């Protein structure tokens, strides 16, 4: 029977006999004495097999190789002074093995080295194909342990400190496509009808408020069929919360306390409160993003009013058509950024055009306040405009000014992208710094140019401010996002809880009364039976753990993630299914079957 995990043996165990189970991380033979590093999910401890002191185990120790599974029973001893290993929590002790039992061997060559001492870089596709081996590695074990600690801290705080109740909501529900595409599941017993996997528990948690469960939470699995990137997965996990009879201020205060509790429990960090707040308008104006990384400066400057009368048609034309002209000022940019990078073919020019810009205009500030740029800008700014530009941007000799001109969406996306790239490149970001802030006062709606209609910026169940109800199209939402070092880790709002207002919002986003009734009739009816005022929030657990772990991809904090092509390399999912299964589901495929060979 196991007495300890490998990583838990300490100096206070010296003199005791312990039984451990684990994998051979490394085997070394020093002058006839065999040293084994034994590993389990808790860490590594050193095992010693000496032919004189532990003859019963020595023959077995000679047979062992990396990743063999063994049981070890032995006596804990203090390491000699010269053998202490301060890098390991178990580095003050070693275990003299009285018995070693081989439980299983490795019968194939390992696709990569698992040992904690190996520093080789392993291709991600190989790691994902052999994920069960990758999860044995020290970094991945630490990440999953961190994830567990985060969830544990969430549960303990919400249940023990705030009287929340954990309630599960359905995974098979109906499709209500308003955002990303749904994953659909055919119903065998109801031919021609389909379930959808939930993109969030949004409607069910609101119904729980109607039912009187005024403080609900759930560690919820969610599904979205969308294009992937480093911090997205087709299936992901949320901490989902909903509360009745609470104001926005009370919800924000409770959630700040929750986040501070998580940081204290899992990282030992005391976060200052209250968290800073920016309105959506302020964030977009200063940073070009509603999830700004505020660990560094490089704030944007709006010069639209200054450029509307300039002779440079790109700038004046952008303003005349309702767009913006903004500047990203870069101190010492003249020395740090060459012309090659900001002209066509350069990497920064490409960043701008990839964001939708038609080009990248710039000004270099020289000694004496002289400006150096392409002739079209220089020749079409008056001396007064030049002076005002330098004054507003705080530009000094050596500054590089990068311009964005066009629609607000393109200008903000372009300069936000450049700001992030240059912030990292110029080492302006302290990786140890933690900046958390709330973004508040979002617009209720944004214009969808492709579909030529308004759509909800968050979702159509978000409540407007009461004073904005008379003109919903320009209303601000009682919504809030939590931003952590440039990543949105949580988002929520107060909800609509009156039937008529909910119908008006559906109408504003282009849903006819018939469509609204067909998709959301059950919710509208529920609102007729005494619905309390309520609001909530959801945290992206994967993204939060990624940031706490210092990783760059959420795939490194998920046990069995999908690739950016939404595939599981371990199981080869998704895969074709047997024709008989499709017939049972009354489903026919429009894709041509794959031809083997």
Curated annotation (Swiss-Prot):
Gene Ontology CC entries for this record: cytoplasm
Chain residues that bind L-aspartate: 178, 224, 458, 495
GO biological process, one term: aspartyl-tRNA aminoacylation
GO molecular function annotations of the record: aspartate-tRNA ligase activity; aspartate-tRNA(Asn) ligase activity; ATP binding; nucleic acid binding
CDD domains tied to this protein: AspRS_core, EcAspRS_like_N
A family per Pfam: GAD
Superkingdom of the source species: Bacteria
EC number of the protein: 6.1.1.23
Catalytic EC class: ligase
Keyword tRNA-binding annotated: no
Site residues by UniProt (Important for tRNA non-discrimination): 30
Gene3D superfamilies cross-referenced by the UniProt entry: Bira Bifunctional Protein, Domain 2 (3.30.930.10), GAD-like domain (3.30.1360.30), Nucleic acid-binding proteins (2.40.50.140)
Alphabetical UniProt keywords: Aminoacyl-tRNA synthetase, ATP-binding, Cytoplasm, Ligase, Nucleotide-binding, Protein biosynthesis
Primary subcellular site in the record, as a coarse category: cytoplasm
Recorded catalytic activity of this chain's protein: tRNA(Asx) + L-aspartate + ATP = L-aspartyl-tRNA(Asx) + AMP + diphosphate
Compartments, record wording: Cytoplasm
Region of interest (Aspartate), ranges: 202-205
Role this protein plays: Aspartyl-tRNA synthetase with relaxed tRNA specificity since it is able to aspartylate not only its cognate tRNA(Asp) but also tRNA(Asn). Reaction proceeds in two steps: L-aspartate is first activated by ATP to form Asp-AMP and then transferred to the acceptor end of tRNA(Asp/Asn).
Quaternary context: Homodimer.
Entry similarity comment: Belongs to the class-II aminoacyl-tRNA synthetase family. Type 1 subfamily.
Protein name: Aspartate--tRNA(Asp/Asn) ligase
Species classification: Bacteria, Bacillati, Cyanobacteriota, Cyanophyceae, Gomontiellales
